[in-house]
Regions:
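Single conserved hydrophobic/aromatic residue that forms the stacking wall/gate
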Residues: 172-181
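Conserved PLP-anchoring active-site segment centered on the Schiff-base-forming lysine
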Residues: 80-102, 114-119
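Short, small-residue-enriched loops and turns at beta-alpha junctions
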Residues: 10-11, 39-42, 99, 122-125, ...
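Active-site core of PLP-dependent enzymes with the aminotransferase class I/II
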Residues: 126-128, 146-169
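Buried hydrophobic positions in well-ordered alpha/beta secondary-structure cores of metabolic enzymes
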Residues: 5-6, 20, 52, 69, ...
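Conserved N-terminal alpha-helix of the aminotransferase class I/II PLP-enzyme fold
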Residues: 32-71, 75
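N-terminal "arm"/small-domain region of PLP-dependent enzymes with the aminotransferase-like
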Residues: 1-33
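Short amphipathic alpha-helix with an adjacent loop that forms part of the alpha/beta core around
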Residues: 128-137
Length: 181
């Protein structure tokens, strides 16, 4: 069989499976517990957090793990709206986002936020110009996926980030469980 749906689910590499098997077999304690299994799990979790932080050039206390992409998207979007809601109530996203982004946007609309949904161009991309035109003084968040999980269209996130920096909008959310690294 030729499997072509890696944007939905990708088989993990053998090294990942080996480490996960080891952790699930030998290090299954609750990392918040004070017994031996919990302490071991806490140590491994701290190591993982430090490795990810180092790879990102971030501080370990700024790295958070979630159960998956949907939880991460929800957390990021709702947190941004809560934190920045006093500054404005406008959010820009795309009409072709994953439901993990679209559903939180709909919930925020029900709470009084205004969401602009950008349509992709003929190639399936969101242009920087279209995004710039959608910005307003009360825009608090831009949420754009890097790679569309259904079409494979790749947005130029670096160009989007540069434009947002020039426009002095400091918060961008990128839903990115699809792109291979």
């Amino acid at each position: 069989m030729i499997y072509l749906d890696n944007s939905a689910t990708t088989q993990p590499c053998e090294a990942c499976v080996r480490v996960m098997t080891e952790l699930l077999t030998d290090c299954w304690g609750n990392p918040s517990s004070v017994h031996a299994h919990g302490i071991a799990a806490h140590h491994r979790l701290r190591q993982a957090r430090e490795q990810v932080a180092s790879a990102l050039g971030a501080e370990p206390d700024r790295v958070f793990f979630t159960s998956g992409g949907t939880e991460a998207d929800n957390w990021a979007i709702f947190s941004a709206a809560e934190r920045l809601g006093k500054r404005g109530h406008h959010i820009v996203t795309t009409a072709v986002e994953h439901h993990a982004v679209l559903h939180p946007m709909q919930k925020l609309e029900a709470k009084g936020f205004e969401v602009t949904y950008l349509q992709p161009d003929r190639e399936g991309n969101i242009t920087v110009d279209a995004l710039k035109k959608a910005l307003r003084p009360d825009t608090i968040l831009v949420s754009v996926m890097m790679v569309n999980n259904e079409t494979g269209a790749v947005n130029d996130i670096a160009a989007v980030a540069r434009m947002l920096k020039v426009e002095n909008l400091s918060l961008i959310h990128i839903s990115e469980p699809t792109r291979p690294y």
